[in-house]
Curated annotation (Swiss-Prot):
Name of protein: Kinase suppressor of Ras 2
Domain note: The protein kinase domain is predicted to be catalytically inactive and seems to have very low intrinsic kinase activity. This low kinase activity can be increased by interaction with BRAF.
Function according to Swiss-Prot or TrEMBL: Location-regulated scaffold connecting MEK to RAF. Has very low protein kinase activity and can phosphorylate MAP2K1 at several Ser and Thr residues with very low efficiency (in vitro). Acts as MAP2K1/MEK1-dependent allosteric activator of BRAF; upon binding to MAP2K1/MEK1, dimerizes with BRAF and promotes BRAF-mediated phosphorylation of MAP2K1/MEK1. Interaction with BRAF enhances KSR2-mediated phosphorylation of MAP2K1 (in vitro). Blocks MAP3K8 kinase activity and MAP3K8-mediated signaling.
Activity regulation info: Kinase activity is inhibited by ASC24.
Active site (record annotation): 786
Organism of origin: Homo sapiens (Human)
Tissues and organs where the protein is expressed, per its UniProt entry: Mainly expressed in brain and kidney.
GO cellular component: cytoplasm; cytosol; plasma membrane
Segments forming domain Protein kinase: 666-931
PTM sites of type Phosphothreonine: 272, 276, 497
Length: 950
C-alpha cells in the first residue's frame, strides 16, 4: 500500500472505526519492519558509507510517510467514534526509536501519559521542556524537534510535498556535521589553526613571533589572508593578531580556499601596506578592511613556480607580500624553473627559540601546508653554494639524514577503504573501525570527514642527481617480496630544480621510512579477450556440425578436428565465425579439449577429450571465509629496478597479524562440505564457525602468496547478504579460513526440492538479495568468479553469498593435475560467460581466466534461469556440446520453461554475448523491482486471519 497512490477524494472522505483500525494496523506492520531495517543499518553497517547513508535516508522518509498515514486515518474518524485502540496510533515509542532517544527516557514515560499528537501541537520550547522532564538531553531534543517539524509539514500538506521534503533535516552541530542518530555530535571539534594577517606589520622578523596565543581549548578559525616575507630572505611566519582582536571563522568559500590550493601558483614578493584591523559592532566582527585574497593567492610549494627575487623596495618597515602572478595554464612539457636554496643570517632558523610562537612557528607553518607534523633538522643550516646571489630567496637546507615532507604537490587524496581494529581519525580525533586511508599521504579519517581533511601532498625525495627532485607515488610493500640492499642516505643531495608536473619517470624509487604501505585492489582480474583462431588449413576435412539448433542465428560451427591440427596451432580451439588475425607475441589462444592416446581415428590422430569430474553431494560448502576489500596492491617491480630502501613493517603484514587465528584455538568438528577449494568443517572458535582447510605444499611460495592475497581481500566485507569473515590461519602447513556458520540450505538444494513452492514473488526476492550482495562486492572491487546456486545459502527469506574470490587460488591448488586434461566440475560450464569459455585450456590455470564484473552478471543469469526452470541449462548435454554452444552464444529454448516476457528479458540481458551489453547489478535491481507483483486474492486465508483479529 503506497500513500502516494491515494487520491485526494479518498483522503477527504471519512472512515469507519473498523476500516481506520485495519489501515492503521497494516501501516503499523510496515513501520515495524522499516524500523527494524533502520536500526540494523545504523548498528550493523558502516554508517560512513554513502550507500548506507542513502538507505537510511530512504527508510526515514518512508517512516515519516507511514506515521503521516496513520495520523490521516485517525483524523478521518470522528472523535465520538474513536476507541482506546485507535487512540494508540501512532505509537510514540516507535517515533522515539526513529529519533534514537535513549531507552531510559522511554521507560520514564508512562503509557497514555504522552502521545505523538501532543508533541506535534507543542512548540519547540515546549517539546524540550516536556521531554527533558523524562531525562532527555539537548541533542535528543534537537533531533526530536527536527523530526517533529518534518512530520508536521508532511501531515499538514496532506502528502503533497516533494520527496526532498519527506526527508528529516537533522540539526547540525558547531562543527558543521549533522547531529543525527547515525552521525552523533562530536564532543571536541577538530581545531584548524590557520595563518592570518596581522593588522600591523612589525618592522623586524623577530617581531613576527611576539604575540599572545589564543585562549587554550577554544577553536581557532583564522583565515589565511596572505603570507608575509620580511626583507631578510628567510621564510618567516606571518605576525599574529593583536590582543583585543578576534579572528573570524572562515566562511564555506574560505574553507574551500584553504583546502583546495592552486595547481601551479607563482610566488613573487611584492610590497603590501598594513592590513586594516577588524571593527567591532554589537559583538559582531566585520570583515577586515583589506578583503581576503581568493584561493589562487595562497602559497604552496609545487612545481612550476618562478624564481623568488628580493623586492626592489628596501623599506624594512613594510611587509612583503607573497602573491601570484597571472600565468596561463601549465603545459605538460613546460620547462621546470630553478629554485636556488641558500642559508641566510636573516632566516627563521636564527630566531631564538624562546621568541618563537607555539602557534605560528616554522613547524606549524610547514605542517599547515603539508598536513603532517614534519621532522625538523637538529643541525644548523648549511650553505649549499659558496657564491650568494642578492636576488635569490634563502631558506635553510634540509637535513640529509631525514626524508622531508615539506615540499609536496596539492593533489586529490587517493582514498581506499580500510578496516582497523583500533584507529583514530586524523580529522575529528574519534576512534573508528571503518574508514578511508589516503595512499599518498597516509591520512586516515572517517568517510564523513573527507570534506574537512587537509590537502594531500606527495612526498618528494632526492635521487643521486643533485639537480633534480623526483616525485614518487606511494609504493606498496609486497608481503612476500623482500626488499633488497638499502641505499646510503648520504647519497641524497639538495635539489635545485623541480620536476615536470605531468611526467613521471620510469625509474621511480620507493619512499624511505614511510609509516606503512598501502595497496591497490588486486581482487579484480582484467578481462582481456583471447586472440581469434587461425583459419583452417585447406587439407583439413570439414567435420559435421555438432548439435544443430534452429535457435542459433549464426552459421553452423565445425567441431571435431584432428589433434595434430591443434598442436600445429599451439593447441587452440577453433571457432569458425571469428575473423582470423595474425598471431601476436602475447599468449596464444588455448585449446579446451585435450589429446589422449586412446581411440585413434582420422589417420591415427587422437581425438581431444574433456575430463568431467563427478558431482559430489559434499561439494556444497556450508560457508566461506571471506572478507574482502579494495586495498591489496602487487609490488611494482619497475620501481625497485634502481634501489630499495629499508622500511618499517608494512601495513599488509600488520593486517595479516591482526586477522591471524592460531590453529590450536580451533575446535574442528564434522566434515560438512568438500569442494574445489578444500574441505569445510563445522568447528568452534568463540562460537560456532565454519573452518575451510586449505591444502598446499609446504614449500610452494606461489600458493602461500595467493592465499595471503585473498585473505587481504576478504577482511573488509560487511554486508547482510555476504558471509562474515572472522579470520584465517596463516602459518603453514595449517592454512584455514574461518567464517560464520551459514544457516539453512544451499539454493541448489532449495530449487530442486519439489515441496518448496517458488512463485514469482519469492524468486524475485531471492534474486534481489543476491543482487544486493553482488552489487556490494563489486562496489568494493571484488569479483566472485564462482557465483552459482551451491555458493548461495537460503534460510527463511535471507540469502547469504559465500566462496567469493576463492577462485583465484584454485589454479595453484591443482598443480598436480594432468597437463593434457581440463578438469570440469558438473554444472560449472553453464555459469561461464562466452569470453571465458573461449579461453579454457588445459595449460591455462583457472585463476588466469578473464573474469570480470560482466562474467559475474552472466553467472547470475544462470541462477535466474535455475530459479524458474529448477535445473541447469543444457543439463542433458555433454560438456563438449555445452562448450561449443555457450562459446558461440547459443542459448537454451526458453519457450519450454514457460517464462514470462519480463522474466525472459532479464535472462537475455544477463546472457548477452557481448559483455558490454550486460547490465550492472544496480540496473538489474531496477529491472527486478519493475517486475509485476502477484497480489493475493481476497479469498486468500491471510485476509480471513486479519479480519478475525479485528
Amino acid at each position: 500500500m503506497d500513500e502516494e497512490n491515494m487520491t485526494k477524494s479518498e483522503e477527504q472522505q471519512p472512515l469507519s472505526l473498523q476500516k481506520a483500525l485495519q489501515q492503521c494496523e497494516l501501516v503499523q506492520n510496515m513501520i515495524d519492519l522499516s524500523i527494524s531495517n533502520l536500526e540494523g543499518l545504523r548498528t550493523k553497517c558502516a554508517t560512513s558509507n554513502d550507500l548506507t547513508q542513502k538507505e537510511i535516508r530512504t527508510l526515514e522518509s518512508k517512516l515519516v510517510k507511514y506515521f503521516s498515514r496513520q495520523l490521516s486515518c485517525k483524523k478521518k474518524v470522528a472523535l465520538q467514534e474513536r476507541n482506546a485502540e485507535l487512540d494508540g496510533f501512532p505509537q510514540l515509542r516507535h517515533w522515539f526509536r526513529i529519533v534514537d532517544v535513549r531507552k531510559e527516557v522511554l521507560e520514564e514515560i508512562s503509557p497514555g501519559q504522552l502521545s505523538l499528537e501532543d508533541l506535534l501541537e507543542m512548540t519547540d520550547e515546549q517539546v524540550c521542556e516536556t521531554v527533558e522532564k523524562y531525562g532527555a538531553n539537548r541533542e535528543e531534543c534537537a533531533r526530536l524537534n527536527a523530526s517533529l517539524s518534518c512530520l508536521r509539514n508532511v501531515h499538514m500538506s496532506g502528502g503533497n510535498l516533494s520527496k526532498q521534503d519527506w526527508t528529516i533535516q537533522w540539526p547540525t552541530t558547531e562543527t558543521g556535521k549533522e547531529n543525527n542518530p547515525v552521525c552523533p555530535p562530536e564532543p571536541t571539534p577538530w581545531i584548524r589553526t590557520h595563518l592570518s594577517q596581522s593588522p600591523r606589520v612589525p618592522s623586524k622578523c623577530v617581531q613576527h613571533y611576539c604575540h599572545t596565543s589564543p585562549t587554550p581549548g577554544a577553536p581557532v578559525y583564522t583565515h589565511v589572508d596572505r603570507l608575509t616575507v620580511d626583507a631578510y630572505p628567510g621564510l618567516c611566519p606571518p605576525p599574529p593578531l593583536e590582543s583585543g582582536h578576534r579572528s573570524l571563522p572562515p566562511s564555506p568559500r574560505q574553507r574551500h580556499a584553504v583546502r583546495t590550493p592552486p595547481r601551479t601558483p607563482n610566488i613573487v614578493t611584492t610590497v603590501t601596506p598594513p592590513g586594516t584591523p577588524p571593527m567591532r559592532k554589537k559583538n559582531k566582527l566585520k570583515p577586515p578592511g583589506t578583503p581576503p585574497p581568493s584561493s589562487r593567492k595562497l602559497i604552496h610549494l609545487i612545481p612550476g613556480f618562478t624564481a623568488l627575487h628580493r623586492s626592489k623596495s628596501h623599506e624594512f618597515q613594510l611587509g612583503h607580500r607573497v602573491d601570484e602572478a597571472h600565468t596561463p595554464k601549465a603545459k605538460k612539457k613546460s620547462k621546470p624553473l630553478n629554485l636556488k636554496i641558500h642559508s641566510s643570517v636573516g632566516s627563521c632558523e636564527n630566531i631564538p627559540s624562546q621568541q618563537r610562537s607555539p602557534l605560528l612557528s616554522e613547524r606549524s607553518l610547514r605542517s599547515f601546508f603539508v598536513g603532517h607534523a614534519p621532522f625538523l633538522p637538529s643541525t644548523p643550516p648549511v650553505h649549499t653554494e659558496a657564491n650568494f646571489s642578492a636576488n635569490t630567496l634563502s631558506v635553510p637546507r634540509w637535513s640529509p639524514q631525514i626524508p622531508r615532507r615539506d615540499l609536496g604537490n596539492s593533489i586529490k587524496h587517493r582514498f581506499s577503504t580500510k578496516y582497523w581494529m583500533s584507529q583514530t581519525c586524523t580529522v575529528c580525533g574519534k576512534g573508528m573501525l571503518f574508514g578511508l586511508k589516503c595512499k599518498n599521504c597516509k591520512l586516515k579519517c572517517h568517510n564523513k570527514c573527507t570534506k574537512e581533511a587537509p590537502p594531500c601532498h606527495l612526498l618528494i625525495i632526492h635521487r643521486g642527481d643533485p639537480a633534480r627532485l623526483v616525485r614518487t607515488e606511494s609504493v606498496p610493500c609486497d608481503i612476500n617480496n623482500p626488499l633488497r640492499k638499502p641505499p646510503r642516505y648520504s647519497d641524497l643531495h639538495i635539489s635545485q630544480t623541480l620536476p615536470k608536473t605531468n611526467k613521471i619517470n620510469k625509474d621511480h624509487i620507493p619512499v624511505p621510512y614511510q609509516p606503512d604501505s598501502s595497496s591497490n585492489p588486486s581482487s579484480t582480474t582484467s578481462s582481456t579477450p583471447s586472440s581469434p583462431a587461425p583459419p583452417l588449413p585447406p587439407s583439413a576435412t570439414p567435420p559435421s556440425p555438432l548439435h544443430p539448433s534452429p535457435q542459433c542465428t549464426r552459421q553452423q560451427k565445425n567441431f571435431n578436428l584432428p589433434a595434430s591440427h591443434y598442436y600445429k596451432y599451439k593447441q587452440q580451439f577453433i571457432f569458425p565465425d571469428v575473423v582470423p588475425v595474425p598471431e601476436t607475441p602475447t599468449r596464444a589462444p588455448q585449446v579446451i579439449l585435450h589429446p589422449v592416446t586412446s581411440n585413434p581415428i582420422l589417420e591415427g590422430n587422437p581425438l581431444l577429450q574433456i575430463e568431467v569430474e563427478p558431482t559430489s553431494e559434499n561439494e556444497e560448502v556450508h560457508d566461506e571465509a571471506e572478507e574482502s576489500e579494495d586495498d591489496f596492491e602487487e609490488m611494482n617491480l619497475s620501481l625497485l629496478s634502481a634501489r630499495s630502501f629499508p622500511r618499517k613493517a608494512s601495513q599488509t603484514s600488520i593486517f595479516l597479524q591482526e586477522w591471524d587465528i592460531p590453529f590450536e584455538q580451533l575446535e574442528i568438528g564434522e566434515l560438512i562440505g568438500k569442494g574445489r577449494f578444500g574441505q569445510v568443517y563445522h568447528g568452534r572458535w568463540h562460537g560456532e564457525v565454519a573452518i575451510r582447510l586449505i591444502d598446499i605444499e609446504r614449500d610452494n611460495e606461489d600458493q602461500l602468496k595467493a592465499f595471503k592475497r585473498e585473505v587481504m581481500a576478504y577482511r573488509q566485507t560487511r554486508h547482510e547478504n555476504v558471509v562474515l569473515f572472522m579470520g584465517a590461519c596463516m602459518s603453514p602447513p595449517h592454512l584455514a579460513i574461518i567464517t560464520s556458520l551459514c544457516k539453512g540450505r544451499t539454493l541448489y538444494s532449495v530449487v530442486r526440492d519439489a515441496k518448496i513452492v517458488l512463485d514469482v514473488n519469492k524468486t524475485r526476492q531471492i534474486a534481489q538479495e543476491i543482487v544486493k550482495g553482488m552489487g556490494y562486492l563489486h562496489a568494493k572491487g571484488i569479483l566472485h568468479k564462482d557465483l552459482k546456486s551451491k555458493n548461495v545459502f537460503y534460510d527463511n527469506g535471507k540469502v547469504v553469498i559465500t566462496d567469493f574470490g576463492l577462485f583465484s587460488i584454485s589454479g595453484v591448488l591443482q598443480a598436480g593435475r594432468r597437463e593434457d586434461k581440463l578438469r570440469i566440475q558438473n554444472g560449472w560450464l553453464c555459469h561461464l560467460a562466452p569470453e571465458i569459455i573461449r579461453q579454457l585450456s588445459p595449460d591455462t590455470e583457472e585463476d588466469k581466466l578473464p573474469f570480470s564484473k560482466h562474467s559475474d552478471v552472466f553467472a547470475l543469469g544462470t541462477i535466474w534461469y535455475e530459479l524458474h526452470a529448477r535445473e541447469w541449462p543444457f543439463k542433458t548435454q555433454p560438456a563438449e556440446a555445452i562448450i561449443w554452444q555457450m562459446g558461440t552464444g547459443m542459448k537454451p529454448n526458453l519457450s519450454q520453461i514457460g517464462m514470462g516476457k519480463e522474466i525472459s528479458d532479464i535472462l537475455l540481458f544477463c546472457w548477452a554475448f557481448e559483455q558490454e551489453e550486460r547490465p550492472t547489478f544496480t540496473k538489474l535491481m531496477d529491472m527486478l523491482e519493475k517486475l509485476p507483483k502477484r497480489n493475493r486474492r481476497l479469498s486468500h486465508p491471510g485476509h480471513f486471519w486479519k479480519s478475525a483479529e479485528l
